[in-house]
């Protein structure tokens, strides 16, 4: 379902069988209401525009058209909604089935700075207690870099050159 949103839009979900729509139906309106791209995707989009602008200067014949640039903006919003759908559906299912301590492991994108799934969990279960752990990469390991502060309650600090998988 998130893939359908990322390559198309939220309307793509309405074409899913009714049985599938039960999984995301409760959060669909919330996701549809998102009008601003997530800063993570906005940053990626801005980098693409910068590369495009430099490319435009060196190869004007291959420059992105205004239509292509608008499509890039729309794609950024679709990606934001797709990630929001994942977070909202995960949160809805956790909130509906939570009976005790629950450990949910996911990538930083989904929980850093109290965003992503945490936003939805707090909406669906306002009294929920959440503790987050975030992995950060930095050169100096003895002290948390100020840019990493506020991402989580606890940190796993690794050297910048640590191999990463996505």
Predicted regions and their residues:
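A substrate-binding/cap region within the structured catalytic cores of diverse enzymes
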Residues: 1-97
């Amino acid at each position: 379902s998130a893939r359908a949103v990322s390559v198309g839009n939220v309307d793509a979900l309405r074409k899913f069988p009714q049985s599938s729509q039960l999984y995301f139906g409760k959060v669909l309106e919330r996701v549809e209401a998102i009008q601003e791209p997530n800063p993570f995707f906005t940053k990626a989009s801005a980098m693409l525009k910068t590369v495009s602008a430099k490319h435009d200067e060196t190869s004007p014949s291959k420059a992105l058209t205004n239509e292509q640039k608008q499509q890039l903006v729309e794609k950024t919003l679709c990606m934001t909604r797709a990630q929001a759908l994942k977070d909202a559906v995960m949160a809805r299912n956790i909130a509906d089935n939570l009976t005790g301590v629950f450990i949910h492991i996911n990538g930083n994108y989904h929980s850093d700075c109290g965003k992503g799934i945490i936003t939805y969990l707090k909406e669906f279960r306002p009294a929920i207690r959440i503790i987050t752990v975030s992995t950060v990469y930095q050169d100096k390991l003895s002290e948390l870099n100020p840019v990493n502060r506020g991402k989580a309650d606890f940190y796993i600090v690794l050297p910048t050159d640590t191999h990463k998988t996505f």
